[in-house]
C-alpha cells in the first residue's frame, strides 16, 4: 500500500511510526503544518511529525494553505498514492485533494463519532464527564469529521486521567486502528457506515475564557474542567493568577473511583462538612502532604498540583507551605 501521511502534533506520531514499521505499507511522504515560533527566543520550531519525517528521510511538504499551493498539489498528484492517512493535520482538505488517492482518504479521529466532531474532542469529552471515549476511522468527505465511519474502538477513562494522558492512550490505540483499517479497506472488507447527523455533537477550539474556574460549580464539574483543559485552568489567590492542573473531588459519590491512598480521607471529609456555610472558593482544610481543600458549589476539591504566577508547577502541599496558606482564605476573588 502506497501512503501519504498527513499529521502535525505528537498525537499523530504513533500512527506514522506504526505505518513506517509495517512491511506492506510504503510511506511516500509526509504533509505537515509549517514550523511555528515558540519558546522564550520565539524561534521557529518543528512540530512532532516533522521530526519523525526528517529522521526517516521522508519527502516533506509544509504548505501554509495546502488547497492553494499548486506546487504541493502537483507533487501529491504525481505520487499516485493508494491512501492518504490523515491524523490531526490541522487544515481542511479540498474535494480536489480528497479525490487524489486511489482508495480514499482515511482519517483517524479521537472520538466515538458522530459525537465530538471538531478540533478538541478529547478535551471536551473529559469536560463533559464522559467515562468512555475512543477512536474512529472514517472515509473523509468535504465536511468536518462527517465522513462515513469504517472502524471504532472504545477506551474507558478514569476519573483522574487528564487530557494529555488520555491523548497518549488514544494515539496508540489509533495507530493500531489505522493499520487494521487500511488492511481491510484495501481488500474491500469494510462497509462504510454513514454517520447519524442527529446524534452529532461538537468539540470546538478551546477559548481563553474556557480556562477560568468558577468555584460555584460542583466539585465534579471543576474536576472535569481541570483535567479536560489540562494544564491551563486558572483561578486567583491574593489577586495573583494561579493555575490548577490536578485535583481530587471529595465526597461519598466519588470514593469508589479513587485510588486507595486517597480513600483514607473519607472519614475526615464527609458530605456534611461540605454542606456547611462556606463561600465557594474558600480554603476549608489542609490535607497533610497532599494540599488545600477548597469549598465548591457542591462538595470539596483537593488541589494536588498548581502553578503560582511566575513559579514552577508544584504539589498542592508545597503550595500550602510556600504560600503559607490559611484556612478561610478564598480563591477566585478579583
Swiss-Prot record:
**Catalytic reactions of this protein:** L-methionyl-tRNA(fMet) + (6R)-10-formyltetrahydrofolate = N-formyl-L-methionyl-tRNA(fMet) + (6S)-5,6,7,8-tetrahydrofolate + H(+)
Q: What does this protein do?
A: Attaches a formyl group to the free amino group of methionyl-tRNA(fMet). The formyl group appears to play a dual role in the initiator identity of N-formylmethionyl-tRNA by promoting its recognition by IF2 and preventing the misappropriation of this tRNA by the elongation apparatus.
Q: What enzyme category does the UniProt record give?
A: transferase
Instruction: Tell me which Pfam families the record gives.
Output: Formyl_trans_C, Formyl_trans_N
Q: What is this protein called?
A: Methionyl-tRNA formyltransferase
- Give the transmembrane ranges: none
Question: Which InterPro entries would you find in this protein's record?
Answer: Fmt (IPR005794), Formyl_trans_C (IPR005793), Formyl_transf_N (IPR002376), Formyl_transf_N_sf (IPR036477), Formyl_transferase-like_C_sf (IPR011034), GART_AS (IPR001555), Met-tRNA-FMT_C (IPR044135), Met-tRNA-FMT_N (IPR041711)
Which residues participate in (6S)-5,6,7,8-tetrahydrofolate binding?
Answer: 111-114
GO-annotated cellular components: cytosol
The gene is fmt
Q: What is its EC number?
A: 2.1.2.9
What keywords sit in the KW lines?
A: Protein biosynthesis, Transferase
Q: What is the lineage of its organism?
A: Bacteria, Bacillati, Cyanobacteriota, Cyanophyceae, Gomontiellales
Amino acid at each position: 500500500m502506497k501512503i501519504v501521511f498527513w499529521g502535525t502534533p505528537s498525537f499523530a506520531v504513533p500512527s506514522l511510526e506504526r505505518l513506517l514499521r509495517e512491511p506492506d505499507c510504503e510511506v511516500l511522504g509526509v504533509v505537515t503544518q509549517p514550523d511555528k515560533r515558540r519558546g522564550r527566543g520565539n524561534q521557529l520550531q518543528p512540530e512532532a511529525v516533522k521530526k519523525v519525517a526528517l529522521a526517516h528521510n521522508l519527502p516533506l511538504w509544509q504548505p501554509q494553505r495546502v488547497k492553494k499551493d499548486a506546487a504541493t498539489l502537483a507533487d501529491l498528484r504525481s505520487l499516485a498514492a493508494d491512501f492518504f492517512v490523515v491524523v490531526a493535520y490541522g487544515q481542511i482538505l479540498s474535494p480536489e485533494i480528497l479525490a487524489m488517492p486511489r482508495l480514499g482518504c482515511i482519517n483517524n479521529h479521537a472520538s466515538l463519532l458522530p459525537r465530538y466532531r471538531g478540533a478538541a474532542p478529547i478535551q471536551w469529552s473529559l469536560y463533559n464527564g464522559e467515562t468512555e471515549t475512543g477512536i474512529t476511522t472514517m472515509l473523509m468527505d468535504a465536511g468536518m469529521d462527517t465522513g462515513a465511519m469504517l472502524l471504532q474502538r472504545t477506551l474507558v477513562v478514569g476519573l483522574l486521567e487528564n487530557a494529555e494522558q488520555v491523548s497518549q492512550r488514544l494515539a496508540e490505540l489509533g495507530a493500531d486502528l489505522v493499520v487494521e483499517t487500511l488492511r481491510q479497506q484495501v481488500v474491500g472488507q469494510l462497509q462504510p457506515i454513514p454517520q447519524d447527523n442527529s446524534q452529532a455533537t461538537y468539540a470546538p477550539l478551546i477559548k481563553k475564557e474556557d480556562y477560568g474556574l468558577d468555584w460555584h460549580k460542583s466539585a465534579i464539574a471543576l474536576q472535569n474542567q481541570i483535567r479536560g483543559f489540562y494544564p491551563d485552568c486558572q483561578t486567583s489567590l491574593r489577586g495573583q493568577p494561579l493555575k490548577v492542573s490536578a485535583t481530587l473531588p471529595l465526597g461519598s459519590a466519588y470514593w469508589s473511583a479513587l485510588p486507595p491512598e486517597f480513600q483514607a480521607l473519607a472519614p475526615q471529609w464527609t458530605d456534611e462538612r461540605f454542606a456547611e456555610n462556606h463561600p465557594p472558593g474558600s480554603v476549608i482544610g489542609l490535607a497533610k502532604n497532599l494540599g488545600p481543600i477548597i469549598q465548591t458549589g457542591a462538595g470539596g476539591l483537593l488541589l494536588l498540583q498548581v502553578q503560582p504566577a511566575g513559579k514552577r508547577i508544584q504539589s498542592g502541599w508545597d503550595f500550602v507551605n510556600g504560600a503559607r496558606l490559611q484556612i478561610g482564605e478564598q480563591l477566585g476573588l478579583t
